């Protein structure tokens, strides 16, 4: 009579230990990933996660976490490199030549194929900024590029912007989130729905909204 009871006790303890170990592993796994997740609550409505349309403070704040441009501002409003590691302005103030970093990748997406990602190259800026200017897109941030004559991808890491006339404040305008780089293949795949399926280069990738 004692042996069956002992067997039951041993079986119960064994199952309990296994369950405890399983739950411990799950909890440990979740805990290890928690530091990689940024949860954000916004009291105002977010209208879009497409940087070309991010005209409100709440839209811009979120897009700041998802996208990058050629340059950025620090807390003292100094212009600093971002994807462009440096730049040269011609003596006549008409041509801005940007040397791009070659280690910046887009967030992972199936449209990128086998590796699920790819590096940002100059033609991505040509596409992104031409899209911003496109009257058919009707982006509210298009005014930022009113002084621009053309964009040119010299090669993968050299990008040129030609102005219609000298405009010293132009480099500062490029720090606005409107001028973020986006991947053409993803933007064209989603169309207007890119606003809720953003793929950029920022420190965070959108999980859900």
PLM regions and their residue ranges:
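Solvent-exposed coil/turn segments that connect beta secondary-structure elements
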Residues: 43-46, 54, 75-76, 92-94, ...
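C-terminal motif of bacterial Sec signal peptides marking the signal peptidase cleavage site
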Residues: 23-24
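N-terminal lobe/hinge region of extracytoplasmic solute-binding protein
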Residues: 41-91, 130, 137, 197-201
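Immediate post-signal peptide segment of exported/extracytoplasmic ligand-binding proteins
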Residues: 29-39, 200
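Surface-exposed binding/hinge segments that line
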Residues: 137-186, 203-208
């Amino acid at each position: 009579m004692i042996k069956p009871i002992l067997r039951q006790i041993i079986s119960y303890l064994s199952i309990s230990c296994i369950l405890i170990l399983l739950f411990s592993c799950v909890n440990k796994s979740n805990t290890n990933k928690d530091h990689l997740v940024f949860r954000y609550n916004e009291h105002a409505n977010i209208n879009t996660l497409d940087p070309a349309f991010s005209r409100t403070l709440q839209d811009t704040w979120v897009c700041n976490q998802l996208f990058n441009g050629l340059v950025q501002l620090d807390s003292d409003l100094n212009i600093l490199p971002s994807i462009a590691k440096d730049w040269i302005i011609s003596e006549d103030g008409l041509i801005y030549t940007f040397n791009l970093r070659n280690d910046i990748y887009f967030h992972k997406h199936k449209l990128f194929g086998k590796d699920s990602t790819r590096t940002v190259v100059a033609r991505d800026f040509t596409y992104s900024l031409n899209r911003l200017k496109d009257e058919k897109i009707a982006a509210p941030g298009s005014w930022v590029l009113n002084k621009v004559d053309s964009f040119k991808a010299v090669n993968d890491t050299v990008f040129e912007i030609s102005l219609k006339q000298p405009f010293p404040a132009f480099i500062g305008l490029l720090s606005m989130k409107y001028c973020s780089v986006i991947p053409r293949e993803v933007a064209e795949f989603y169309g207007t729905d890119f606003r809720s399926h953003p793929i950029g280069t920022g420190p965070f990738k959108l999980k859900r909204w």
